[in-house]
């Protein structure tokens, strides 16, 4: 009997690993069954019982073949949290990072996860509350990552019960309430990341000072107010401190300089005041310091040479004094951004000589003297931005050898001398801006080396000589601005090869010869300004077929011959052909007194009202005398009748005029075919075509047959409790529209013809868009049953994206729309799209400007507002990009972002959930042809990128345009990295991916 027992024991010990192996494999297979695996990432998880799971992808085992780790990061898995994995008895680490794990988490999911040490569920689609029982279900947990989901409700106060937790990351969710003070009890914490949630305004809990082992504290965008609590001075192990995008006040505490291990301090975009701590030199481990966009005063401390700084950002403060010479001795400094301050003096001569500088932006200060010759001393400088200072002297030959440069902006200084030849041909240079200086010399042929050049801005200098043919080899060039120089010779024929060219301004030079004839390649040319030169010959008729040209100024030249009739094909905002030697008939479209100044100074021109121009023959002159006598007699009769009618009309309109036009100030931005009285006559209720928060919109049909849209802003409401119904809001809306639309020109931006401002009446007159808004077409019950096909929708998306890209990247300063939505995208007669309604637009404010900023109760519209707005109450271009992403998803689904079918989800969440559960086809608007499914899928991907919860993960509008062009086939695909999201590396704050002053 004893022998049998011993034999049985031996046999069972022999088979125990096998039993455990089979048990682990069974659990893993069951987990696989509960998940959708479109990428076949789990294909190695075999059904064969003889195959060890230790060799399966994502599975790791210990020495006894027990599964201890499951890492399914970025496997593109879809489904609920696979809680069955917790049944793996030896499981210590579980990662489902960057998948589409959805649904909510419950306490039951973690009942059997007692052995877990690390749990990573970040970058998924989880919703609902965080289970309060997690500290009790996971007593051994050291690492908890749930960032980048859609979790809501508060952080459970029970999280203070974790006894071994070292890292807690809940960033990028929709958590509310406040940061629980109980977290101060988790004294084992080394990393606490709660950034970018929807917390209520509150102070930093003083109890966090108990976390003396804390190395990373990331509380960016947490709606924090008040000063930094003194208790945080006990966090002597801190390496990274990030408090950006809050409303913290007071001075930067001096104890912060006593942190002996700190490498990064980010205080960007708060309301800190006072001076920088004098003892900053004590922080010998500090690598990155950013206190930009605060209210700091005083001087930059002089002991920065004691630091190992890699990045120093102090822009948009009120700092004064010189840049300390000691900063030149920093051997690690790569980023120096001090723009928009009051800094003065001469830059240290050795700046850059001992530092690997990459990004230097000292714009909008009061610096003087020469640009340091060794600023690119180590050959790594990429950005050199020194706009609007008082720098003088010449550009060093050393800069002409700096092949790493990509953006150079030196405009509005007092620089002079010749530009080094090598400087013109730097191979990586994309933007060269030298405007408003006193440079001399010519553009050398070496410019052919600047293969990446896209913007050449050299206006208002003393450049001379001819424009080299080699510029025509720079295929990516978008802008050539060389006005107000002394260029001579002919316009090179090679320029017509520049297919991406959008702006060509060579006005006020000494150019001669003819305009090149083969202009058909200028498909993107928006502005052509050759005024004030010595150009001659005929105006090429090819100018009239340039599809997006809206600014044409050829005035003050020596052009001759007739005006091409083809110019009537253009939709011009600006036309000026004055002071030339043109002759013949003015094209009928322009035979109007409002264009008189555009043709003045051309004695040979005539207006052919009756099919007759002047003939210099005696017999014809006699005939004209009789005709003129008859005309005068008839005119006299008409005049008398007209006077009577005019008096009657005046009496009728007197009341209207007295109230709306008595003190009116009309301001036009284009050549007008109508008068203000025509507009006032048509502001009748029967002509109302729309209502908005700021007023009514009228359709006005003018006597000449033209149609315009007129927005009449609401009158101020006296009394009441709504602060946003006041007259100040009307003024802000009016100012924002005028400031924005009155100064920009783009084919995808609606035109503002003119405006009127009087005591009680404000009118904005726009071009009329006959097909209404995108919202009307997608969601309205329109007569005629207009259904937008996919090609039309894709074109609308691209048009709108180009308009927003122009606002963000090509306007100086950049413009944030702040209310991007389908009802603010208007459609012309060909269903081309134009961005409209800039009533709450925000113009980026430059140093010293008095730019008004229009405000409203909410910057945006329901369903389109970016999530970060709720906790920062601030907007930037990333807010527009989020809203545009919603529009893209709206175009694909045909649903409104407030549609009841979406339930409590926003558009992006609904699309993600529907894709996970049902696949692509149910998401697509049933009105669309599924033969375009591949293109539609790509646009959905772009829309989801744009609506990423973290601003960091949203592409720029310029990138969005490129991606949409790739979808439409307008440009070849560039094979971008299509991974869903990437973990933030380096700096914690997600607002550093694009240069803030790199327009």
From Swiss-Prot:
Disruption phenotype: No visible phenotype; due to the redundancy with HSL2. Hae and hsl2 double mutants have a strong abscission defect. Its main location: membrane. Autophosphorylated on Ser, Thr and Tyr residues. The gene is RLK5. One of its GO terms (cellular component) is plasma membrane. Residues 683-968 form the Protein kinase domain. This is Receptor-like protein kinase 5. Residues 642-999 are cytoplasmic. It comes from Arabidopsis thaliana (Mouse-ear cress). Its cofactor is Mg(2+); Mn(2+).
